[in-house]
Structures are given as structure tokens and as C-alpha cells.
From Swiss-Prot:
Keyword Signal: no
Record protein name field: Meiotic recombination protein rec7
A GO cellular component annotation in the UniProt record: linear element
The keyword Ribonucleoprotein is assigned to this record: no
Keywords: Meiosis
GO biological processes: homologous chromosome orientation in meiotic metaphase I; reciprocal meiotic recombination
Pfam families in the record: Meiotic_rec114 (PF03525)
Domain of life: Eukaryota
Described function: May be involved primarily in the early steps of meiotic recombination.
Length: 339
């Protein structure tokens, strides 16, 4: 006979179901409790008075009617043991607590020698708390990963602040009449950008490198070529071609601005003896001997054009009249001045 001291004895009221969620327990810790195990017979006494007796081996090999569960369930969690025994259609539950883990391990060894196997004694509430803690831990890890990814993305795309800027623009136009050139100097155009903070989630921006670093400008909405109807097709003189320099149909020559370092070439009619005129500006005098005048189209293309070439020429001349092309030239001028 093996006898082990018990410091606490807990017993639940008998029930007719295996559900233990609504069962009242009684706890005794007055002392004088002992547990004895002899050939599978478990007995609990208090001051030599027998208060519990169960044959563990008989119940271990029996099943609860209508189920696949054994009539005996042993749960352990140092230094406690919980025993559930279904006998006489009644479920009995009681729990014992040993003075130390040493007494607990000695008693458990005696149970296992009989072929009895213990399960984990974590209650459903403890398992639920464990699962909740695991879920919260996983959620916190996921949130941490998401925050790290967001911070990393924000670090790679820093906020951009555009300060107000003043960009003067000057348009210089020439009009070729009777092989002579007249100069028109309109007032400078002022372009002021308001205070604005543009963050990384703003619409797409054009980027170009200036003297002060990377500068960004919003994309310009150009006129769609497909929106031009057939009724707007141009009617040009077949004997007029455009030169290789930028050209404004409203003015026979167009300058990129007062600070432009490139010459201005006027349109030259075909079969004409008049060569393209080069408009010299004060700022361009230093480049007069460095940059040659580009050849005109009349010097490159043959006098007789094919039908496809004529159609292509007409389309090019027509599109050059559009405001979108002029705006593009102005944008290129501003970009060039900043480079």
C-alpha cells in the first residue's frame, strides 16, 4: 500500500452529464487527508475516515454508454491531480493537491505503473485564455510588421514640400513679311506657385534635376489628338514647309524665351531663294560662332513630294498650331532654364 499526504481535497457535486461548466465544488484544507493506492483501488481518508473509494482499473477499461469516452479520466498538473469517474450512471469529480512536487511525482509514478495515463489538466477557461493570449500576441506581431512596413515605405518616400517660386517667362516672336523680320517683345509672363505641401500620395509628377536638387511638377493635361474632328483638318499651301526649329503657325518664327541660346528659324516656302533668317539676341552673341544654323527642310527634302509625304506634312503643320504644342514648348523652356 502506498500512502501520500494531501494538503487540499476538492469534490464536486455528482452530475449526470459530462459537462462540467455549471458544477459546484467544495474545498477542504483542514488537514489530515491521505491518498492510498493498492492494486488499482484508490481511497481517500480524513483522520482514518474513508470518504472516497474507486476502483481505477475497472473504470479504465470501460466506456461511457453511447460514447467513445472512457469511464475514467485522469488529469494532472503539478502538484494537483483531477479524477473524473463515471460509475452507476453518475459522474464523480474530485481533486487532490500534494504538499510538494516530489510527493506529486511519486504518486504519479504509482498511477503510471498500473497503465493509467494522465492528460493535461488545463481547464477550458485556461485554454480559452491561452488561445486569446496567443491570438493577441499574433495580432500584435502582425500590427508591428505592418507598422514597420509602413514606416519603411514612408522612409523611402519622404514628404515633399514645394515652396512658392517666381519664374519669369518671356516670349519673343518674329513675323516674316516680304523677306523682312519684325520683332515683337511682349511683357514677361509671371508664374507664381501657391503654398502647397505635396506628399507621396499625390498624383503623378514630372521630375527633373535642377540646381537645387530634384524638383517636381504636376503632369500637364495635353489635348488629345483623337479629339480633333475631321472638320478641323487644315488647308495649307502646298508650297510651304516648316523648318527644323520650333515653329508657331500664328507667328512665322517663335523663340523659347529671352534666355534661349538657340537661334530662331522662320518658315521657308518651297522653291524660294530666301534662306531662313537667324534672329540674334544679345544673350546669343557668345554662341554666334559656336552653334551653326540648322538646315531647312527645303535643303533636305526633294522639291517633289509624294502623296504620303504631303499628308504627313499637312498633319504636322496642323498639330503645330495647337495650344498643347505651344504649352509643351513653354514647359521645355522652363525645364531647360533650370538645368
Amino acid at each position: 500500500m502506498n500512502i501520500f499526504p494531501i494538503v487540499k481535497y476538492s469534490v464536486a457535486e455528482d452530475s449526470y452529464t459530462t459537462d462540467s461548466s455549471h458544477i459546484n465544488w467544495s474545498h477542504y484544507s483542514d488537514g489530515g487527508f491521505t491518498l492510498s493506492l493498492t492494486s488499482g483501488l484508490l481511497q481517500i481518508r480524513q483522520h482514518e475516515e474513508l470518504i472516497q473509494s474507486i476502483n481505477l482499473l475497472d473504470l479504465w477499461h470501460q466506456l461511457i454508454p453511447g460514447t467513445k469516452e472512457k469511464c475514467l479520466t485522469l488529469l494532472s498538473r503539478a502538484p494537483c491531480m483531477n479524477i473524473r469517474a463515471f460509475t452507476n450512471n453518475v459522474m464523480k469529480r474530485f481533486q487532490v493537491k500534494f504538499p510538494s512536487d516530489v510527493h506529486y511525482m511519486k504518486a504519479k509514478v504509482e498511477f503510471e505503473k498500473l497503465g493509467l495515463v494522465f492528460k493535461d489538466a488545463k481547464s477550458s477557461s485556461e485554454k480559452k485564455q491561452f488561445n486569446n493570449s496567443q491570438s493577441q500576441s499574433n495580432n500584435s506581431q502582425e500590427l508591428s510588421l505592418m507598422n514597420n512596413a509602413y514606416n519603411k515605405s514612408s522612409a523611402q518616400q519622404p514628404n515633399l514640400l514645394l515652396q512658392p517660386s517666381y519664374i519669369p517667362m518671356t516670349q519673343t516672336a518674329t513675323t516674316a513679311v516680304n523677306n523682312s523680320t519684325n520683332y515683337v517683345n511682349p511683357a514677361p509672363l509671371q508664374h507664381v506657385m501657391p503654398n502647397a505641401e505635396i506628399f507621396s500620395n499625390t498624383p503623378p509628377l514630372k521630375r527633373f534635376r535642377g540646381d537645387a536638387g530634384m524638383t517636381q511638377m504636376p503632369l500637364r493635361s495635353d489635348t488629345s489628338i483623337e479629339s480633333i474632328t475631321a472638320s478641323q483638318q487644315p488647308t495649307w499651301d502646298e508650297n510651304v514647309v516648316i523648318t527644323s526649329s520650333p515653329f508657331n503657325p500664328n507667328r512665322n518664327a517663335y523663340s523659347y524665351g529671352a534666355n534661349s541660346q538657340y537661334p530662331i528659324i522662320a518658315a521657308t516656302p518651297l522653291n524660294s531663294q530666301t534662306q531662313a533668317s537667324w534672329v540674334a539676341q544679345p544673350e546669343n552673341q557668345a554662341y554666334a560662332n559656336l552653334i551653326p544654323s540648322p538646315p531647312t527642310t527645303s535643303q533636305i527634302l526633294p522639291t517633289e513630294l509624294t502623296e504620303e509625304e504631303k499628308q504627313l506634312r499637312s498633319k504636322v503643320l496642323f498639330y503645330l498650331k495647337q495650344d498643347s504644342f505651344i504649352q509643351l514648348c513653354q514647359s521645355l523652356e522652363r525645364v531647360w532654364n533650370k538645368m
